[in-house]
């Protein structure tokens, strides 16, 4: 009766599911046993009328699992608008992957297994940075359970339902937790907390055997076979002598013989067809006594150039940066276009605007803010560069979202300024400063870095780098590398006249599958036009 009452209470909590679906975009997944696969019901019909995708029914081979709806809430209230955005930039849900179970036994009351959420498009695993709740604490919807370190940033993970935190499966500091792997258990009733003290989630138990699988032993046995040749087969050496003057030996045997000044012609091989192997060299050195004199000198030489070093573990952001950039260089056919842009008028306009900003107490506008604005307007003129490659088609985006590279102590981040072509310089400057600060504090949220269609990387202003080539940020088709401005002598009007002008080199890296050379040159021409005539950006 106690379990029946719990099921009835839980059913009451779910009576407003239809209302919840009206307020939030959600995907409902019902778990049925193999013997209880239900047909479409009223909620399925309701979801289809709202335009949600068909519900996925997953059978779990368990006789102790009852059909219960589990709701994964998304971060946006309008899913249809997100579908028009880049596929890699849509608002990914901070999914708290969970599974609710009811046990027929007395040791397992109703509980919920909370899995590692998928917090970014590229996330496959995460780390538990900090638990904000302890075992036994009461939790409510919207409260933060823990902080998860993703491949992009550290994100707070919120609780979805009311209850009590019965068990923390993955302790604080746990690393490389696969998406969906159970990290905590919650229960509805406080008295059920103690029953999960020694509980091991089924997903964790299932994963253990795969990790514990030892490396097969046969390959190691093959290595032992060669040096284990006994001395007895020496009698068979003359039966397979090498023909001619050529001496057949393995590369390792040749190297060992060379290091110890051993003539190969003095050794008869015991390998296939009389081939000299390492065991033959070792036996020769042992019998002649050369091994004792030659090896100490080698070890003495090897100790002399000893290196002092420290091994730094890979952070999550470093792993993702390495894998994405390696993927980019290996799969994207890069080409590079460089042009010099005169920035005298740009610097003059910036000085005028900053004088107005200072008078009104506002923040100054940086050269990088003007570069971001010019890049966004050039993308509006040449939309082919605002695209992405897929195997079946080229996707051209209507939104101009500019990622801005920010270097921090934790690694490289690329937060995004969305709809940069429609924003003013002050707004762009404020957003870039805010995003850069959040990146340095490691507090970026998924919506702060997802959805970019083009990237700007500036090493000129902060570091004085004259010119460089950046790696395309997949799945984007282009990235702009901005160098430092320098004064140059340029010809004047007369034959003996000259002037000074400041030039800033920029290099456009393109994906040749999407952007042809002429299209990339057209974009650079448009960008240069905005930089050299900056007032046109204000129109």
UniProtKB/Swiss-Prot annotation:
A UniProt-annotated Pfam family: 2-oxoacid_dh
Residues found modified as N6-lipoyllysine: 152
Chief location bin: mitochondrion
Catalytic-site annotation from UniProt: 512, 516
Cofactor dependence: (R)-lipoate
Transit peptide feature range: 1-102
Any GO CC annotation of this UniProt entry: mitochondrial matrix
InterPro entries in the record: 2-oxoA_DH_lipoyl-BS, 2-oxoacid_DH_actylTfrase, Biotin_lipoyl, CAT-like_dom_sf, E2/Pdx1, E3-bd_dom_sf, LAT1, PSBD
Family designation: Belongs to the 2-oxoacid dehydrogenase family.
Job of this protein: The pyruvate dehydrogenase complex catalyzes the overall conversion of pyruvate to acetyl-CoA and CO(2). It contains multiple copies of three enzymatic components: pyruvate dehydrogenase (E1), dihydrolipoamide acetyltransferase (E2) and lipoamide dehydrogenase (E3).
NCBIfam families with a match to the protein in the record: PDHac_trf_mito
Protein known as: Dihydrolipoyllysine-residue acetyltransferase component 3 of pyruvate dehydrogenase complex, mitochondrial
């Amino acid at each position: 009766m106690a379990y029946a009452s719990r099921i009835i209470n839980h059913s009451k909590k779910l009576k407003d599911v239809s209302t919840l679906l009206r307020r939030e975009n959600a995907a409902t997944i019902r778990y049925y046993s193999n013997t209880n696969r239900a047909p479409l019901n009223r909620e399925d019909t309701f979801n289809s009328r709202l335009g949600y995708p068909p519900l996925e029914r997953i059978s779990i081979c368990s006789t102790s699992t009852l059909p219960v709806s589990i709701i994964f809430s998304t971060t946006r209230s309008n899913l249809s608008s997100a579908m028009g955005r880049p596929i890699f930039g849509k608002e990914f849900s901070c999914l708290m992957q969970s599974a609710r179970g009811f046990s027929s036994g007395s040791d397992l009351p109703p509980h919920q297994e909370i899995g590692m959420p998928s917090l970014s498009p590229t996330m496959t695993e995460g780390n538990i940075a900090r638990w904000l709740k302890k075992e036994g604490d009461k939790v409510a919807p919207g409260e933060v359970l823990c902080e998860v370190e993703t491949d992009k940033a550290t994100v707070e993970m919120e609780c979805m339902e009311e209850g009590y935190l019965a068990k923390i499966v993955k302790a604080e500091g746990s690393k490389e937790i696969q998406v969906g792997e159970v990290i905590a258990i919650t229960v509805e009733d406080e008295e059920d907390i103690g029953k999960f003290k020694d509980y091991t989630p089924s997903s964790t138990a299932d994963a253990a055997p795969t990790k514990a699988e030892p490396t097969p032993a046969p390959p190691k046995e093959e290595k032992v076979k060669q040096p284990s040749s006994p001395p007895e087969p020496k009698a068979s050496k003359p039966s397979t002598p090498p023909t001619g003057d050529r001496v057949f030996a393995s590369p390792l045997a040749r190297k060992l013989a060379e290091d110890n000044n051993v003539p190969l012609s003095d050794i008869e091989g015991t390998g296939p067809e009389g081939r000299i192997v390492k065991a033959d060299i070792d036996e020769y050195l042992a019998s002649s006594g050369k091994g004792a004199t030659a090896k100490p000198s080698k070890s003495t030489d090897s100790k002399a150039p000893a290196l002092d070093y420290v091994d730094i573990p890979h952070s999550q952001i470093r792993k993702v940066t390495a894998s994405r950039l390696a993927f980019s260089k290996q799969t994207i056919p890069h080409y590079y276009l460089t042009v010099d842009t005169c920035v005298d008028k740009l610097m003059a306009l910036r000085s005028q605007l900053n004088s107005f900003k200072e008078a009104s107490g506002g923040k100054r506008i940086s050269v990088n803010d003007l570069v971001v604005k010019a890049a966004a307007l050039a993308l509006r003129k040449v939309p082919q560069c605002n695209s992405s490659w897929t195997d079946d088609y080229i996707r051209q985006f209507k939104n101009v979202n500019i990622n801005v590279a920010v270097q921090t102590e934790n690694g490289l981040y690329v937060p995004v300024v969305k709809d940069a072509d429609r924003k003013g310089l002050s707004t762009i400057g404020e957003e870039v400063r805010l995003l850069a600060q959040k990146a340095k504090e490691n507090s970026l949220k998924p919506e702060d870095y997802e959805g970019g269609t083009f990237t700007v990387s500036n090493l000129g202003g902060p570091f004085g780098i004259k010119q460089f080539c950046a790696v395309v940020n997949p799945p984007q088709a282009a990235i702009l590398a901005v160098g430092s401005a320098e004064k140059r002598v340029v010809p004047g009007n007369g034959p003996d006249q000259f002037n000074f002008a400041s030039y800033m080199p920029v290099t456009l890296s393109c994906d040749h599958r999407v952007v042809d050379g002429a299209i990339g040159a057209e974009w650079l021409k448009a960008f240069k036009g905005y930089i050299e005539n900056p007032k046109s950006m204000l129109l």
